[in-house]
């Protein structure tokens, strides 16, 4: 399952690179794209809340696409900046909360959804703290942010085309893999800092 998600992520990247170059040539700001990603995430949340799951999925895809493109646009246009990095990192966390907490409106346990949000944020926090200490965390852990977003997409898709129960099983798997990633990253940082 995870290897399949990773392959999907690679295919998405092949689409993103030429799109990012086009946007950079059109002088579209990376920070504007970052803000657009948050707006789409907010719309996604409210559409799921209103039981418009199909429309919610569409806005989830738009939001995830903006998130994938903004950094590439900044790199291609040579406009990488501390402000852009701050905006991207902060708004990504808000989007993560919106993506996962919307599962409450599908009838999932609010307690489990809260735990899933906490685990997801912990993964990101461990990476941020580790990198502030000079450690490299990219690629550490079984399920990174890109895979987590794809998981959210598939859970919603199964909810529509199969059943709530099947999507709930996938949500449980999502929680398990997220918890494993927290442990993997914690152990990796702990091991590196002990040397």
Curated annotation (Swiss-Prot):
Q: Where is the active site?
A: 92
Q: EC class of this enzyme?
A: transferase
Record has Transmembrane as a keyword: yes
Q: What membrane topology does the UniProt entry give?
A: Multi-pass membrane protein
Would you kindly state one Gene Ontology biological process term found in this protein's UniProt entry? phospholipid biosynthetic process
Q: How is the cofactor bound?
A: Binds 2 Mg(2+) or Mn(2+) ions per subunit.
> Where is this protein found?
Cell membrane
Recorded hits in NCBIfam families, A to Z, give: archin_ph_syn (NF040950)
**Protein name in the entry:** Archaetidylinositol phosphate synthase
Organism per entry: Saccharolobus solfataricus (strain ATCC 35092 / DSM 1617 / JCM 11322 / P2) (Sulfolobus solfataricus)
């Amino acid at each position: 399952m995870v290897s399949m998600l990773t392959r999907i992520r690679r295919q998405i990247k092949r689409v993103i690179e030429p799109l990012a170059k086009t946007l950079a040539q059109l002088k579209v700001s990376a920070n504007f794209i970052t803000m657009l990603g948050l707006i789409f995430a907010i719309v996604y949340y409210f559409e799921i809340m209103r039981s418009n799951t199909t429309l919610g999925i569409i806005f989830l895809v738009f939001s995830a696409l903006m998130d994938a493109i903004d950094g590439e646009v900044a790199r291609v246009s040579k406009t990488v900046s501390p402000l852009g990095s701050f905006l991207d990192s902060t708004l990504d966390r808000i989007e993560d909360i919106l993506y996962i907490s919307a599962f409450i409106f599908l009838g999932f346990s609010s307690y489990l959804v809260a735990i899933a949000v906490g685990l997801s944020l912990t993964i990101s926090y461990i990476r941020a703290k580790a990198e502030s200490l000079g450690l490299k965390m990219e690629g550490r852990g079984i399920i990174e942010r890109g895979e987590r977003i794809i998981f959210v997409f598939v859970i919603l898709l199964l909810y529509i085309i199969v059943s709530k129960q099947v999507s709930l099983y996938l949500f449980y798997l999502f929680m398990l893999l997220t918890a494993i990633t927290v442990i993997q990253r914690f152990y990796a940082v702990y091991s590196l800092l002990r040397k």
